[in-house]
């Protein structure tokens, strides 16, 4: 079982590492490519677009051909794209490389969740996804620090060679450690069950909405945090970095505690707690009389996301034993596109950073609480339905 956990964690972590590691080198990249930093900031959106594009096909391929045939090309593409970025001499070529990186990371991301659905039952999967969420929170803190240390001695291209090295390590894991977990092709008697695993069932769609809104909350916070903390609240750059590190610490602590909480409380209770924390955060930020109270509201955001997201993802994947790849892709596309659409629309309409965050917090909590309370889980995994544990 440990091989599947290690491989799944590695497959998922490629995605945030690809986002956060290069940011520290952005000024030098812009100077070398004769582009402005503003022009290259679109590299974040291009990377996410690549991920979304990969998710359009990766899930279906993973369900038909297996998890390894998607993970291996995904890791290989990430390696090639990282090298391509390091060799880019124009901003257009650099952005093309970032799109290809996103394609590779998206393939790996989809496979990771499909593997966890293949190998873990509902309760264990919720615990593992909560742990994974905590580990993922470390990357935005560690990746820029690692990038800074690398650039003390080496040029910005070394950041992408480091990413390529990470891709090589993942490729080796996928080739030699990861075992295929895709369930056997459905027999004639399994066809009714396969057909019953519809992406349009109410429970799955409710969890798609909940997880998409939750991701929108956390990405809105990340995107608006420089404005909120430095421009509005007046913190210096060093203080901003410290606050963001502390929020990551809150996320990690809550995420690592959630598996223990699942041994005491029902998953539904933790999901309700998550949304109540979001609602409390929105109200706190809306009426905050001081910076200290605002910072407390920010910690509620991190805690709310960490306590509920892994549980919601586990519930979303639960009904799909034969179509886990497609379900994982659907979740990923909805989360990437939905959160990006909200941030873009809010900016176009001219909603300020503070109101943008408060608005999504309150909307997410109200909609999600209604869905949690009124959309009951579908059928559990039947007793005869095998959970695939491989040696």
Swiss-Prot record:
PANTHER family to which the protein is assigned, alphabetical: CHLORAMPHENICOL EFFLUX PUMP RV0191 (PTHR43124:SF3), PURINE EFFLUX PUMP PBUE (PTHR43124)
Q: Which gene encodes it?
A: mdtL
GO terms classed as biological process: response to antibiotic
What is the recorded name of this protein?
Answer: Multidrug resistance protein MdtL
Cytoplasmic side of membrane: 1-3, 63-68, 114-130, 179-202, 266-268, 314-330, 377-391
Q: Which residues cross the membrane?
A: 4-24, 42-62, 69-89, 93-113, 131-151, 158-178, 203-222, 245-265, 269-289, 293-313, 331-351, 356-376
What Gene3D superfamilies does the annotation carry?
Multidrug resistance protein D
What is the role of this chain?
Answer: Confers resistance to chloramphenicol.
UniProt superkingdom: Bacteria
Q: In what way does this protein cross or attach to the membrane?
A: Multi-pass membrane protein
Q: Which family does it belong to?
A: Belongs to the major facilitator superfamily. DHA1 family. MdtL (TC 2.A.1.2.22) subfamily.
What do the Gene Ontology cellular component annotations say?
plasma membrane
- From which lineage does this chain's organism come? Bacteria, Pseudomonadati, Pseudomonadota, Gammaproteobacteria, Enterobacterales
List the Periplasmic topological domains: 25-41, 90-92, 152-157, 223-244, 290-292, 352-355
Give GO terms: molecular function aspect only.
transmembrane transporter activity
Species for this entry:
Escherichia coli O1:K1 / APEC
Keywords linked to the UniProt accession: Antibiotic resistance, Cell inner membrane, Cell membrane, Membrane, Transmembrane, Transmembrane helix, Transport
Q: Where in the cell is it found?
A: Cell inner membrane
Q: Which InterPro entries match?
A: MFS, MFS_dom, MFS_Efflux_Transporters, MFS_trans_sf, Multidrug-R_MdtL
